[in-house]
Amino acid sequence: MEVVSKIDQENQAKIWKQIFGFAESLVLKCAVQLEIAETLHNNVKPMSLSELASKLPAQPVNEDRLYRILHFLVHMKLFNKDATTQKYSLAPPAKYLLKGWEKSMVPSILSVTDKDFTAPWNHLGDGLTGNCNAFEKALGKGIRVYMRENPEKDQLFNEGMACDTRLFASALVNECKSIFSDGINTLAGVGRGTGTAVKAISKAFPDIKCTIHDLPEVTSKNSKIPRDVFKSVPSADAIFMKSILHEWNDEECIQILKRCKEAIPKGGKVIIADVVIDMDSTHPYSKSRLAMDLAMMLHTGGKERTEEDWKKLIDAAGFASCKITKLSALQSVIEAYPH
């Protein structure tokens, strides 16, 4: 039998790691559902296995199973285990597993890992031969109909989006002040969700009059102004859209951008908050951005775009120029200027 070389061993290990890649997402979800981070945080001091087991909300707890879950979480570097005392504590990333603060990532974790929202991934390859709608194949209907018929899932999705937007908005208002200080008196936010980003902009720049114009499928619940962006966009010095264009194909995006161009005055601009895929695969967000691209392909038929893709799209919509600013967030800011 052939001896396994060191290189072969390393390559096999990489494949095994990818085979069980799903485990990290689901163990992370389990940690959130069990409130492990909350329990350790509330206790202040590190906790032994038995102490932690006795304080978790779910009771009674099987300590052996909890130990094995914690072992995996420690391996993920989300929690620490002291080699001497055998007690557990929070590692720095675990603060994002705590509920109830503005940078908590719990809603995003629960949304992205939801069993219905992950179901289309099982049909990833189906779309290569024909025009398969993976979401519809997995759940029996397209995503927009599904959301209307399943309000609890729609709420879960919107909470995840709002969570993502809070993280983005913090970076936006702190790192991109110049975007909002060049003659913008009015700003219209157009999108699907809770208006989290526009509210943050309004709070950070109170001199700008901000309005929220939501897509029809969510207006009824959020008491905002309904707007079909394919037909018209509200007039303002700046149009703001976050995570909207990635839901649509290039032709549909060009239509939306043309409506935006018609709505802004000379000296105005369109501010787009969306993923810009990295050509540098070493960027901390590069893998997440590529995964987002696949998620959009599966869920809506949309896509994430590279810097070059964005420039071509904006040029095709008739804009004169654009500027892309990278932030310390999953999304970047793309400013499109009509003149």
From Swiss-Prot:
Alphabetical keyword list: Alkaloid metabolism, Methyltransferase, S-adenosyl-L-methionine, Transferase
EC numbers on record: 2.1.1.117
Sites where the protein binds substrate: 164, 243-247
Active site (record annotation): 246 (proton acceptor)
PROSITE patterns: SAM_OMT_II
Family indicated by similarity: Belongs to the class I-like SAM-binding methyltransferase superfamily. Cation-independent O-methyltransferase family. COMT subfamily.
Protein name, per record: Scoulerine-9-O-methyltransferase 3
